[in-house]
């Protein structure tokens, strides 16, 4: 009886240690990141990751977000994530206030793949793991770029989105939700692709995405790929790479049949009318 007690205590200690053991993940900059076994305090400095965390029902684990979330996702996004109204904002896509960040005691910080290396290093020097998200699967020399050169855009973004969702789900222990989201994305895309299978190239709707200051998305950006999946043709893709400013003469030359404006940029509608 008495010999059994030390063994029981040892077993409990070992079990407790195992339950709190660190784990490793590979982020989308191909960096090995060591994380606590269970994340309950995450800071999110990238809007795409924030959007996915909402869909994975992981917002109860989020204690801080990027300062430009309203600009990036639109003010009406609060309908999907009401807690955003009160969450601290210790940084943004390319900068961080390290004192404010430390005050939140995060166990992990999500950043964009194009976050400055020094920003990532500053957070890591403070002892906080950093996970970079690109939602792309690409060559190593393109991994940290905002405007990548992609040999196969469809493959890079289709597989990269799945990789990113799985990675975020793994970090936040939301694997079942991540797999369900991936399954739904695949099914919905397959449905649309089947309906557009016989659409001739010359019947695709010519479209343009208008952003503030005459900026738009060209080749290598996910926006153009979404347009193509929907049966449209991004008129800017043949002339520009990535996110760039263009001229009104460019837009007139491209002659789009439809101009899209994102809900987060309502002022652009009035600019386009002028």
Model-predicted segments: where are they?
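Sec-dependent signal peptide recognition
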Residues: 2-11
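A short, structured surface patch at a secondary-structure boundary
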Residues: 50-103, 108, 132-133, 235
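Proline-aspartate-enriched helix->loop->beta-strand connector
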Residues: 90-93, 97-111, 248-264
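Short helix-initiation/N-cap motifs at beta->coil->alpha
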Residues: 28, 87-99, 114, 136-138, ...
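N-terminal signal peptide c-region/cleavage motif recognized by signal peptidases
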Residues: 14-18
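Extracytoplasmic substrate-binding proteins
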Residues: 32, 119, 124-211, 236
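Alpha-helical, coiled-coil/dimerization segments enriched in small aliphatic residues
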Residues: 222-247
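A ligand-binding cleft/hinge motif common to bilobed small-molecule-binding domains
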Residues: 115-125, 262-274
């Amino acid at each position: 009886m008495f010999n059994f007690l030390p063994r029981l205590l040892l077993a409990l200690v070992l079990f407790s240690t195992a339950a709190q053991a660190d784990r490793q993940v590979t982020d989308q900059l191909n960096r090995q990141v060591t994380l606590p076994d269970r994340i309950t305090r995450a800071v999110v400095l990238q809007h795409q990751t924030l959007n996915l965390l909402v869909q994975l029902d992981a917002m109860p684990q989020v204690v801080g977000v990027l300062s430009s979330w309203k600009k990036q996702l639109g003010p009406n996004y609060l309908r999907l994530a009401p807690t955003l109204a009160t969450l601290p904002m210790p940084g943004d896509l390319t900068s961080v206030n390290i004192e404010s960040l430390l005050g939140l005691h995060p166990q992990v910080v999500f950043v964009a793949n194009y976050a400055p290396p020094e920003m990532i290093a500053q957070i890591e020097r403070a002892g906080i793991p950093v996970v970079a998200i690109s939602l792309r699967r690409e060559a190593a020399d393109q991994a940290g770029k905002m405007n990548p050169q992609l040999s196969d855009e469809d493959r890079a973004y289709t597989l990269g989105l799945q990789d990113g969702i799985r990675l975020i789900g793994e970090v936040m222990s939301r694997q079942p939700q991540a797999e369900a989201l991936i399954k739904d994305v695949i099914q919905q895309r397959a449905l649309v692709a089947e309906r557009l299978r016989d659409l001739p190239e010359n019947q695709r709707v010519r479209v343009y995405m208008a952003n503030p200051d005459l900026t738009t998305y060209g080749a290598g950006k996910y926006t153009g790929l979404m347009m193509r999946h929907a049966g449209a043709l991004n008129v800017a893709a043949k002339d520009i790479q990535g996110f760039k400013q263009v001229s009104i003469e460019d837009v007139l030359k491209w002659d789009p049949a439809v101009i899209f404006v994102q809900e987060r940029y309502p002022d652009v509608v009035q600019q386009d009318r002028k």
